[in-house]
Structure formats: structure tokens, C-alpha cells
Amino acid sequence: MHLSAVFNALLVSVLAAVLWKHVRLREHAATLEEELALGQQSLDPVLGLKIDYPKALQILMEGGTHMVCTGRTHTDRICRFKWLCYSNEAEEFIFFHGNSSVMLPNLGSRRFQPALLDLSTVEDHNAQYFNFVELPAAALRFMPKPVFVPDVALIANRFNPDNLMHVFHDDLLPLFYTLRQFPGLAQEARLFFMEGWGEGAHFDLYKLLSPKQPLLRAQLKTLGRLLCFSHAFVGLSKVTTWYQYGFVQPQGPKANILVSGNEIRQFTRFMTERLNVSHAGAPLGEEYILVFSRTQNRLILNEAELLLELAQEFQMKTVTVSLEDHTFADVVRLVSNASMLVSMHGAQLVTALFLPRGATVVELFPYAVNPDHYTPYKTLATLPGMDLQYVAWRNMIRENTVTHPERPWDQGGITHLDRAEQARILQSREVPRHLCCRNPEWLFRIYQDTRVDIPSLMQSIRRVVKGRPGPRRQRWAISLYPGKVREARCQASVQGATEARLSVSWQIPWNLKYLKVREVKYEVWLQEQGENTYVPYMLTLQNHTFTENIKPFTTYLVWVRCIFNRSLLGPFADVLVCST
């Protein structure tokens, strides 16, 4: 009787435990379903698309993540993912290994030396690296239910969304061409910015690039604890960038610039259309000079006098514009029809990319700031095909500057420095070359206000602008190169024991008959087989007989190429092997 009671008590306890666990599992399942429903409800209004959830979950749990990248190193790599996931709790991306997972390149531990790729276009910056954590797909059973992002995603970092130069150079231009690097991406993609900034002052410009609202990292938390992208591209093309900011060596143009004015102007045409200013015409009904007015720092102290003198010198209307008092669309409308743009050095000068061909950029530099050391806008203006004139003016008169040593350090203040360093900076006549970004002497000088010396400024402008400034009638701005010469032949003859002739002929490149070219020449290289040096010849005809230094019973290698207008060098035709 005693054993039976004990057995019954144990049985009741086990059944109660099983029932309790069953109830808890049902409650947990109901909670997960509720969370998923809520997550999907919050996701749908933002993303606007739906996905077959059971099918997507099955693909992810069985197949895992798939990655294929282009580019040889982390600085030029863009990766295409299927089923890449992101944990909002860990703030890390996840690669789930399943039966169909692919990881190309499969770098092993080299993926951390230093990263898989750069998320921004600022090359090899340690705050801009992208990587992921690896997990088996089976781990999904123990993780929060994934919320699937149905949109094609382009995932990247903005570098500094409050600075207009960085917005255009580092973000908008690269985004524009990355979206066009892969078919259909420009029409389908949603931009995901993962650097952690807020919207910033120019977020409306990012919205112009895609028909879908961009999302910030902070907004992802509202979508779910674990997000999985059905299709994502990660990284940005750096091919349109022209400037490096001085993190490793003092700032300056990139060593290998790959963008021309043609690509810049294709981008600005798109932007002006999206801003609804492309067909507005000249806003003032006449030619004018546009002066950027700054309202907080780096002021032009005699701005009214400058406007008057520019108007008198060039017999043109002068107007001012500022980022603070004008919408960006109005700024673009004014810049895109201006004959000349005058501004203190600063981010607003990146709007020069909207200037018409033939216009002039005049960049003003405060006292002790060498224009040759800070050239992002000069580099932009002088890109092949931009067809802009560029003038740099520097204040050389100490008395014409007003400094602000009492301001905070990030606005040029120096009172936090010791007295000796303050005295040195105050007496310095030129800021030495330096790295980015907190050099106190640079900040002190670049935030000065300036009284522009009008005569020296006019002299600087007149050295570049000989006549009346203004846009030129649009012309074909792309430099077209010759193709290979065709049907290259050689014929040799021996004149006795010591003399020989080598006759070489060819036909014009086939694309020449479709082009208008001012000057056509041909370059011929002759090299005796076995020698390390060659002899170049520049010719105007399509055949030539060489006699000087041509030896009997000798083999020569001959290369021929066409040159347009002295500087457009075509490819060499296949080498000719000629024996005398």
C-alpha cells in the first residue's frame, strides 16, 4: 500500500512536469509567433514587400549563406550575398554554413587581415571595415526567429554625412555608380547605412538615389532581433573618388585617379533631374558670378566690396548663395548656370561639380594656408572632361585676418595648448604639411576670417581668365583613342655585305574613318632581337623604309601604333618579326 502511494505520487509529479513543460512550450511558441507577426507587421510598412516566410526559413536553415565577391583585396572588394544575416543584439553580421553555402574568396584567417572589405570609400580606414561571424545553420534553432528582408539591399557606410564634400565624394557618387555596376540594382535596391550616424544634414540627397527609403542601423532594431537579407550587396566602388584625406600621408589627389568629367557630369545630370532643376534655365535671366557666403566661420569680412569689384571688373551681375539660407535645389540651380563660382575653401565648393563647362572656380584660402597642400576642389575642377578653369588665391597679409583663439579646439581654438605652442602658432607664416584630422595649427588657421585683398585677387583671376568668364557651348568632351593599325607588314632586302633595308607598312585603324581628328601620327619601335633597347620613330605616313643601322642577316622586332592629337596613344599592333 505504501509503495503504491509512492508510485502514484511519482506518476502524478511526472505528468504534472510534462504538462507544465508542454504548456510552457505552447506559450513560448505563441510568443514567438506573436513576435514574428509583430515584426512582420512593422517590417511590411517600411519595406513594402512580403516574403514567403516558411520557404525562406527552410532555404536558410538547409542551404545557409552564399557569398561571391569581386576584387582582389579588401580595399577594392564588393560582395554579393544571399541569406546574409545581422544580429541587432550583437551588432554583427552572420554567415550561416549550410548544405549550399559558398564563400568566395575563401580566405580563412586572412579575412581578418585586416578585413573582408571596406564598407566606405575611404580606403583602409580601421573604423570602416566589414566582416562577419560564422555559425552552423543548425544554430538558428536556438536563436531569435529571423525576420527576412525582402528587398535587395546595398549595405555600406557613410563616412561623414554632415559634411557636403564627404557626402558627394565619399557617398553619393560611389553609391550612384555601384548601383549601376550590377543589372537592375538601381531600380530595386534599398540602401542600408551601417556606420551608426543619424540622418545628418543632407539625408534628402541620399533619398534621390533609390526609389526606396534608405534605412539606418538604429532603425534595424525596430524590425527584429535577427534580420536576414534574401539578397544583399556589401561595399562600394571607389572608382569615382579622386582625393585622399591624409590619414596615412598628407592629404592630396589619389595616386591613380580613374574618373573623368564625363562620369561626374552623368551623375550631376541625374541629380539635377531628381531635384527638378534640370530644365529650369538661367534663374536670373543673364550671366552672373556666384559668391558663396559663409555665416558662421571662415567669413569674407569685406564681402560687399568683393561683390562690387567683381561686378565692375567683369561687367557681370554678382549674387550670393549660402547653404544656410537656400535649399540645396536652389543652390544647384544657381551654380549650374553660373559663369564663375567664388568661395572660401570649404565643403560647399564640391558644388562646383554642377558648374557648366567653361565656368571658373575661384577658391580663397585664409592666411598661412598653402593652396598647394589642400586641393580637393582643384583636383575636381581639373579632371579631364570637366572643362573648368581653376584659380587659387591666398591671403598673404597677416593684418587682413581675424583669428579666434578662444573658440573650442574643433573650431580653431588654441587656448588649451601651452603658451609656447600658442605663441609658435600665432607667429607661424604657413601651416606645415600634416596628417588628418586634429592638427591645432591647421584648425586655427582654417577657421580664420579674411579681408580679401581685392587687387591681388583680381590679378590671380586674370592670370587664368583672359576674357569674359562664362560657359562654353557644349562640345564632345570625351577623348577617343585610336584602335590598332591593321595589316602591318615588313619586307627586307640586303644591299651587299654591309647594308640592308627594312620596309614597314600598315593600314589606318578602322575607327579613324569615323572620327574627326586634327593630327594623326604613327610611332614605330625597332628592336634588334636579343637586345634590350629599341629605337623609336615618329612618322606621318603609313609606310617607311629604314636604312640607318639596319644590319644584313639580322632579325628585328617591329611594333607600330597610332597616335591622335599628340597625346592619345593607341595600342601597339602585334609584333612583326622581320629578318634581313
From Swiss-Prot:
Keywords: Endoplasmic reticulum, Glycoprotein, Glycosyltransferase, Membrane, Signal-anchor, Transferase, Transmembrane, Transmembrane helix. This is Protein O-linked-mannose beta-1,4-N-acetylglucosaminyltransferase 2. Its main location: endoplasmic reticulum. One of its GO terms (cellular component) is endoplasmic reticulum. Residues 1-4 are cytoplasmic. Pathway: Protein modification; protein glycosylation. The keyword Cytoplasm does not apply. It comes from Mus musculus (Mouse). Belongs to the glycosyltransferase 61 family. Glycans are attached at N99, N276. Its EC number is 2.4.1.312. GO terms for biological process: neuron migration; protein O-linked glycosylation; protein O-linked mannosylation. Residues 488-580 form the Fibronectin type-III domain. The keyword Transmembrane applies. It is an enzyme of class 2 (transferase). GO terms for molecular function: acetylglucosaminyltransferase activity; protein O-acetylglucosaminyltransferase activity. It catalyses: 3-O-(alpha-D-mannosyl)-L-threonyl-[protein] + UDP-N-acetyl-alpha-D-glucosamine = 3-O-(N-acetyl-beta-D-glucosaminyl-(1->4)-alpha-D-mannosyl)-L-threonyl-[protein] + UDP + H(+). It is a single-pass type II membrane protein. Mainly expressed in the central nervous system. It is found in: Endoplasmic reticulum membrane. Disruption phenotype: Newborns are slightly smaller and die within the first day of birth due to abnormal basal lamina formation and neuronal migration defects. Defects are due to a lack of laminin-binding glycans. O-linked mannose beta-1,4-N-acetylglucosaminyltransferase that transfers UDP-N-acetyl-D-glucosamine to the 4-position of the mannose to generate N-acetyl-D-glucosamine-beta-1,4-O-D-mannosylprotein. Involved in the biosynthesis of the phosphorylated O-mannosyl trisaccharide (N-acetylgalactosamine-beta-3-N-acetylglucosamine-beta-4-(phosphate-6-)mannose), a carbohydrate structure present in alpha-dystroglycan (DAG1), which is required for binding laminin G-like domain-containing extracellular proteins with high affinity. Residues 26-580 are lumenal. The chain crosses the membrane at residues 5-25. It holds the Pfam family Glyco_transf_61.
